[in-house]
């Protein structure tokens, strides 16, 4: 009797599971039919139209794009978050003031260096004056797992730190220092060691052009557009310190000659042993004068609450950036001057809208919650996605996956790239499985584009991701990236694959492997 009840219970459970799977399949089938080349084309034709003037951040054209996306989310029945479909992203523009100075005093003899030829502030520099002793901290790297620390044996606290660009053994194909090469990392590391300012020199051993670059401030370059001011994210501006790029003149003063510095680098490269040192009898006085103005732009968000009592607190993010690079202020009469950005990234934004609509039309709601985000300011430095992960609308630790669409409308009609797919093997496997009846030849690429789109911000917060990407083309960031060049059939097929992948993830209870960012 008990055995009969047991088998009856199993039969009922299997029937329920079968019905649930049937409902789910019907729901996804209806959603797939909602994604058509015609709908993709309609979205792209508006977002990449001349009227929006390239959707620069910030601009009236970009505001129009945000309004279009907002209206679509409202039409699809997606919910706002915290009462709004707009999530503000505070940006700061920075221009260079008049009073910028760099003085070097060697045993009582002072030399004034010249802005532009000898030093140029970076756009991420703070404004202010500092004076103090100098420490040379090599490449500015602390890599305990490699047994390498440029700060070993020196005290940078309260001093001005001098560092090289790039990393030891730059030509080594293993690239073991790759993740330590960025200026952002080096400045953060210098601040951790208590410095008051940072001077950056181009590595002369592997690079011929040693003149300072910093930022191409319009006041320093006659042919540079006056509107081309530096843009940074307000939330990252709190930890700024004076930061300038210096040239050969300071190398000669501090090292005797450029060749002497090259010899020092060669020793570091050969032995992987830092040659950092504190200078005695040498002080530097630095003044950086920058002027900041605050700007407003927004990510556009739409939300579908999960249906499962336990899983609804977990979140799947589906994203695409909706900004582009604007238009040329100076141009000849009759020539094209608008960077329409049809593929980059009106195509991905259109895919985002298509997937959002498909989800909304489903009568079966996902178990996990889903947040659709159209990111702003990707072209300026991934600022929209950075702002989100710094101030997330939902607990970041509950975000199980981020699916990103960037440039999904060009290239071979049968080929799809999953960028850096090996870093999220479980999600990549799901996408490959869901592709079975769509039929792309999927290429799981390396990490070349990992930090070039919005998935990067999530990856560096240890969130598994997929970047759906159709590939680069000669019209990338040119005035030729136009709506008529888009393969809307391919874009719609990629959007269907994103839908299927997102649906599977949103109805799963698993957590996915990530080869983590350190």
What are these regions (language model features)?
Residues 53-169, 297, 422:
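Noncatalytic luminal/extracellular "stalk/propeptide" segments of secretory-pathway proteins
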Residues 22-80, 249-253, 257, 313, ...:
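N-terminal hydrophobic or amphipathic helices/low-complexity stretches enriched
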Residues 1-27:
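Bacterial Sec-dependent N-terminal signal peptides
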Residues 112-113, 228-262, 375-474:
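Metal-dependent peptidase/peptidase-like ectodomains
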Residues 114-233, 305, 337-340, 344:
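Extracellular/luminal Protease-associated
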Residues 179-185, 189, 205-206, 326-427, ...:
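Acidic/histidine-rich catalytic neighborhood of metal-dependent amide-processing enzymes
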Residues 26-28, 105-112, 116-149, 153, ...:
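Soluble metallo-hydrolase cores and metallopeptidase-like ectodomains found primarily
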Residues 191, 197, 202, 267, ...:
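Active-site-adjacent substrate-binding region
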């Amino acid at each position: 009797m008990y055995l009969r009840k047991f088998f009856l219970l199993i039969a009922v459970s299997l029937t329920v599971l079968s019905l649930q799977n049937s409902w789910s399949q019907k729901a996804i089938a209806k959603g797939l039919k909602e994604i058509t080349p015609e709908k993709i084309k309609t979205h792209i034709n508006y977002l990449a139209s001349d009227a929006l003037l390239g959707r620069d951040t910030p601009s009236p054209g970009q505001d129009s794009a945000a309004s279009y996306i907002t209206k679509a989310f409202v039409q699809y029945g997606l919910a706002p978050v915290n009462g709004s479909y707009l999530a503000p992203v505070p940006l700061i523009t920075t221009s260079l003031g008049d009073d910028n100075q760099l003085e070097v005093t060697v045993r009582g003899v002072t030399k004034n260096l010249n802005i532009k030829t000898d030093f140029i502030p970076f756009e991420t520099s703070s404004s202010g004056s500092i004076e103090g002793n100098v420490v040379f901290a090599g490449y500015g790297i602390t890599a305990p797992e490699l047994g390498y620390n440029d700060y070993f044996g020196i005290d940078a606290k309260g001093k001005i730190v001098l560092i090289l660009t790039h990393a030891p053994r730059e030509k080594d194909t293993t690239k073991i220092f790759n993740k330590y090469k960025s200026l952002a990392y080096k400045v953060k590391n210098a601040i951790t060691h208590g410095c008051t300012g940072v001077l950056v020199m181009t590595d002369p051993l592997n690079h011929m052009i040693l003149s300072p670059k910093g930022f191409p401030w319009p006041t320093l370059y006659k042919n540079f557009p006056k509107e081309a001011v530096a843009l940074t994210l307000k939330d990252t501006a709190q930890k700024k310190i004076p930061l300038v790029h210096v040239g050969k003149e300071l190398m000669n003063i501090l090292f005797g000659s450029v060749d002497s510095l090259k010899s020092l680098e060669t020793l570091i490269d050969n032995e992987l042993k830092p040659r950092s040192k504190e200078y005695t009898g040498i002080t530097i006085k630095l003044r950086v004068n920058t002027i900041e103005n605050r700007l407003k732009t927004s990510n556009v968000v739409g939300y579908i609450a999960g249906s499962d009592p336990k899983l609804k607190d977990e979140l799947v993010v589906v994203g695409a950036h909706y900004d582009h690079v604007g238009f040329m202020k100076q141009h000849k009469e009759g020539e094209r001057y608008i960077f329409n950005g049809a593929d980059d990234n009106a195509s991905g934004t259109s895919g985002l809208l298509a997937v959002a609509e498909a989800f909304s039309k489903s009568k079966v709601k996902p178990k996990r919650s889903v947040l659709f985000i159209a990111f702003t300011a990707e072209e300026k430095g991934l600022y929209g996605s950075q702002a989100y992960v710094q101030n997330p609308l939902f607990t970041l630790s509950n975000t199980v996956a981020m699916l990103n669409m960037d440039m999904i409308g060009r290239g071979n009609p049968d080929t799809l790239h999953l960028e850096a797919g090996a870093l999220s093997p479980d999600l990549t496997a799901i996408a490959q499985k869901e592709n079975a009846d769509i039929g792309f030849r999927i290429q799981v690429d390396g990490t070349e584009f990992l930090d070039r789109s919005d998935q990067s911000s999530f990856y560096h917060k240890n969130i598994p991701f997929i970047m759906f990407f159709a590939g680069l083309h000669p019209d990338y960031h040119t005035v030729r990236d136009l709506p008529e060049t888009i393969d809307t059939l391919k874009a719609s097929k990629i959007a269907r694959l994103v839908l299927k992948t997102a649906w599977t993830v949103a109805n799963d209870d698993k957590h996915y492997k990530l080869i983590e960012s350190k």
